[in-house]
Amino acid sequence: MAKRDYYEVLGVAKNASDDEIKKAYRKLAMKYHPDRNPDSKDAEEHFKEAKEAYEMLSDGQKRAAYDQYGHAGVDPNMGGAGAQGFGGFADAFGDIFGDIFGQAAGGAARGGRGGPQVYRGADLRYSMEITLEQAAHGYDTQIRVPSWVSCEVCHGSGAKPGTKPETCPTCHGQGTVRMSQGFFSIQQTCPKCHGTGTYIPEPCAHCHGSGKVKETKTLEVKIPAGIDDGMRIRSAGNGEPGINGGPPGDLYVEIHIKPHSVFERDGDDLHCQMPIPFTTAALGGEIEVPTLAGRASFPVPEGTQSGKTFRLRGKGIKGLRSSIAGDLYVHVQVETPVKLTDQQRDLLKQFEKSLAEGGARHSPQSKSWFDRVKSFFE
């Protein structure tokens, strides 16, 4: 069965504030909590649905992903935006664009009934600047990122050599404690051991009891051709390590494309401003323009006006999800000559005089504009 819209579940508008979302969730949680409806499967499902909606909409990144892509943007099992067609990159650099916005850092789940909580490692993020050419053609590079590794002194236990972690006396190794609040009996993470089920009487001096130390590691990054500004590449398992056997987090490389001196990108299309002499605009001719693949030329017809746009098909960028390249839009700007010689001025005056004899035949836009101005004042 298709999932309901999260905003609909909580009964709030899409532009609802964080406080409005929280209040709506609390109201539903009180109404459908299993302790208040012990024999109602329907109430249990409503409670789970509200809890899931709140978890997504109360997290800024997840909410942004959901607003843009819907359930596919926050559910890794649904193959969200950009998740298809990139198996070839997975071997070199994880699952490209799989679950683009990732999960909340340090998510917890119980490792087993009665056992300590298992924590997923936190995600890491790395910002990288590349050129438009690198984005268009693809780019292989290396990055150096900080990484947490197991402490070699205590071998990851966090305890001073010769000692070992002991069972937490507060939760008796469960990782959680149960507290009663009014109608509810709430299970929460043990405040002493933070869900590990153990505590360390004598911490390792090298890692200060964390069981891990930070080092810098080098990763190969394969940036696919057609990547756009703001997109992220996910390197699975290269985030921080998990706790109590939990899976490691992921590394997200966020791509930023430097401004280009000639082109502006719009999706798979490119735009450029091309100055042309007024003689070419009047008489027509062939002009040459740069493209990301080299030079290209196209004819300019007689009487071309400044601001005219020419479309060169297939001279843009081949996008990630496209089998064909976008287009290049050339916006011509007719240049007016400056610093004329006396001879050039005389020639232009003769030319201007000859134009007056032709009237609107030579300047149709000017004639149309003056006609509109005249009717405006009448």
Swiss-Prot record:
Alphabetical UniProt keywords: Chaperone, Cytoplasm, DNA replication, Metal-binding, Repeat, Stress response, Zinc, Zinc-finger
InterPro entries xrefs: DnaJ, DnaJ_C, DnaJ_domain, DnaJ_domain_CS, HSP40/DnaJ_pept-bd, HSP_DnaJ_Cys-rich_dom, HSP_DnaJ_Cys-rich_dom_sf, J_dom_sf
Binding site for Zn(2+) 1: 151, 154, 204, 207
Metal-binding listed as a keyword: yes
Subunit structure: Homodimer.
Function: Participates actively in the response to hyperosmotic and heat shock by preventing the aggregation of stress-denatured proteins and by disaggregating proteins, also in an autonomous, DnaK-independent fashion. Unfolded proteins bind initially to DnaJ; upon interaction with the DnaJ-bound protein, DnaK hydrolyzes its bound ATP, resulting in the formation of a stable complex. GrpE releases ADP from DnaK; ATP binding to DnaK triggers the release of the substrate protein, thus completing the reaction cycle.
Positions with a binding annotation for Zn(2+) 2: 168, 171, 190, 193
Keyword Cytoplasm listed: yes
Any one Gene Ontology molecular-function term assigned to this protein's record: ATP binding
SMART domains in the record: DnaJ
Signal peptide positions on this chain: none
GO annotation, biological process: chaperone cofactor-dependent protein refolding; DNA replication; protein refolding; response to heat
Cofactor: Zn(2+)
UniProt-recorded name of the protein: Chaperone protein DnaJ
Ranges of residues in domain J: 5-70
PROSITE patterns linked: DNAJ_1, DNAJ_2, ZF_CR
Cellular compartments annotated: Cytoplasm
GO CC annotations on file: cytoplasm
Tree of life domain: Bacteria
Cofactor mode of binding and number, as noted: Binds 2 Zn(2+) ions per monomer.
Annotated SUPFAM superfamilies: Chaperone J-domain (SSF46565), DnaJ/Hsp40 cysteine-rich domain (SSF57938), HSP40/DnaJ peptide-binding domain (SSF49493)
Species name: Burkholderia cenocepacia (strain HI2424)
Domain notes: The J domain is necessary and sufficient to stimulate DnaK ATPase activity. Zinc center 1 plays an important role in the autonomous, DnaK-independent chaperone activity of DnaJ. Zinc center 2 is essential for interaction with DnaK and for DnaJ activity.
Classification via NCBIfam families: DnaJ_bact, PRK10767.1
